[in-house]
UniProtKB/Swiss-Prot annotation:
InterPro entries, A to Z: Ig_E-set, Rho_GDI, RhoGDI_dom_sf
Name listed for the protein in its UniProt record: Rho GDP-dissociation inhibitor 1
The UniProt record lists the keyword Plastid: no
GO biological process, one term: semaphorin-plexin signaling pathway
Record's keyword annotation contains Lipoprotein: no
Source organism of the structure: Cavia porcellus
Cross-linked sites for Glycyl lysine isopeptide (Lys-Gly) (interchain with G-Cter in SUMO2): 57, 60
Amino acid sequence: VAVSADPNEPNVIVTRLTLVCSTAPGPLELDLTGDLESFKIKISFRYIQHTYRKGVKIDKTDYMVGSYGPRAEEYEFLTPMEEAPKGMLARFTDDDKTDHLSGERNLTIKK
């Protein structure tokens, strides 16, 4: 990624979003440098994840990603590993024996 010293350029340029799951075949990587018409992404320096069970919020995880000074190399932030909820209602295979964990992923990033 080329680094620009133009004062008219934005201070922060987000070039990539990568989602990592230890049981997935590989990371899901979104290139944010090309045509972004199909993406609706809001970038902030805070990562918040809500966990719901039967429509009720049971957990909220909040990470401060940080503040970074300018440099030529890209910065990388990796959140700590998280464990999915356990129990009868928290499963990846439903009553019809459909395995949701190994299927195609859908990602919704919204406010």
